[in-house]
C-alpha cells in the first residue's frame, strides 16, 4: 500500500510540472502566427530608386503577377521573391530599350549614307561610251594579232613544202642510183643473150657430131 501511494504521488507531481511548459509553448505558437498574419497583410512596395532608374515595358507589366510570400525555415521572415522579380523585369525593360534605336542614331546613319552617296561618282553616259569604245578596240586588236599569227604559220608550212619538193630531184645520190640500175639491167640482158648463143652453138655442134658418127 505504501508503494502504491508513493507511485501515485510521483505521477501527480509530474503532471503538475508538465502543465506550465505546455501552456508556454502554446502561447509562443500563437504569437508567431499573429506575427506571420501581420507580415502577410502588409503591402509590398518596391524601392523608389530602382523604379526611377529602370522603366518597365508593356509586355513585362502584362506578364507581372503578384507572388505569394513564403516563410523561411524557422526564421519567420518572408523571402526576397519580390526583389528578384522586380530585378528580372527591370533587366527585360533595359533589353527592350537597347533593342529600339534612338532617333539620334538613325539620323547619324542617314547622314553617313548621304555623305557616301555624294562621294561616290555617279556613272554618266560619257563614261559608259568610253568604256564601251575601249572594249571594242581591245577586241579588234586581239583579233588582228590572232590573224597575223595564223597567216605566218601557214606561210611557213608552205615554204617548207616547197623546199622539200625542190630538194628531192636535185639529190646527188639519186642520179647515181638510177644510172647504176640502168647499167645493171643492160648487163643482165647481155648475159642472157650470150648464154643463149652459147646454148645454140653447143646444140649445133652436137648435131654435127651425131651426123658424122652415123
Swiss-Prot record:
Residues 23-107, 163-184 are annotated as: Disordered. It is found in: Cell membrane; Cytoplasm. Keywords: Angiogenesis, Apoptosis, Cell membrane, Chemotaxis, Cytoplasm, Developmental protein, Differentiation, Glycoprotein, Membrane, Phosphoprotein, Signal, Transmembrane, Transmembrane helix. It comes from the Eukaryota. Residues 152-214 are cytoplasmic. Residues 19-130 are extracellular. Residues 28-57, 172-184 have a biased composition (Polar residues). Residues 80-90 have a biased composition (Low complexity). May be heavily O-glycosylated. GO terms for biological process: angiogenesis; apoptotic process; cell differentiation; chemotaxis; negative regulation of angiogenesis; positive regulation of endothelial cell apoptotic process; positive regulation of proteasomal protein catabolic process. The modification Phosphoserine is found at residues 204, 207. PANTHER family: ENDOTHELIAL CELL-SPECIFIC CHEMOTAXIS REGULATOR. Belongs to the ECSCR family. Regulates endothelial chemotaxis and tube formation. Has a role in angiogenesis and apoptosis via modulation of the actin cytoskeleton and facilitation of proteasomal degradation of the apoptosis inhibitors BIRC3/IAP1 and BIRC2/IAP2. This is Endothelial cell-specific chemotaxis regulator. The lineage of its organism: Eukaryota, Metazoa, Chordata, Craniata, Vertebrata.
Amino acid at each position: 500500500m505504501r508503494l502504491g501511494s508513493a507511485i501515485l504521488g510521483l505521477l501527480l507531481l509530474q503532471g503538475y510540472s508538465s502543465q506550465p511548459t505546455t501552456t508556454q509553448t502554446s502561447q509562443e505558437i500563437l504569437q508567431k502566427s499573429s506575427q506571420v498574419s501581420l507580415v502577410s497583410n502588409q503591402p509590398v512596395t518596391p524601392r523608389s530608386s530602382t523604379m526611377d532608374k529602370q522603366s518597365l515595358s508593356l509586355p513585362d507589366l502584362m506578364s507581372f503577377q503578384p507572388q505569394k510570400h513564403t516563410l523561411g525555415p524557422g526564421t519567420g521572415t518572408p523571402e526576397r521573391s519580390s526583389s528578384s522579380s522586380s530585378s528580372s523585369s527591370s533587366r527585360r525593360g533595359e533589353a527592350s530599350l537597347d533593342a529600339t534605336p534612338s532617333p539620334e542614331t538613325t539620323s547619324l546613319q542617314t547622314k553617313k549614307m548621304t555623305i557616301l552617296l555624294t562621294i561616290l561618282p555617279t556613272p554618266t553616259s560619257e563614261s559608259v561610251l568610253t568604256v564601251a569604245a575601249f572594249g571594242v578596240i581591245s577586241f579588234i586588236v586581239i583579233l588582228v594579232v590572232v590573224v597575223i599569227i595564223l597567216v605566218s604559220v601557214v606561210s611557213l608550212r608552205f615554204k617548207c613544202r616547197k623546199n622539200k619538193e625542190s630538194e628531192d630531184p636535185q639529190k646527188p645520190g639519186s642520179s647515181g642510183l638510177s644510172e647504176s640500175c640502168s647499167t645493171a639491167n643492160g648487163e643482165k640482158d647481155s648475159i642472157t643473150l650470150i648464154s643463149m648463143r652459147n646454148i645454140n652453138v653447143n646444140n649445133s655442134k652436137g648435131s654435127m657430131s651425131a651426123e658424122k658418127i652415123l
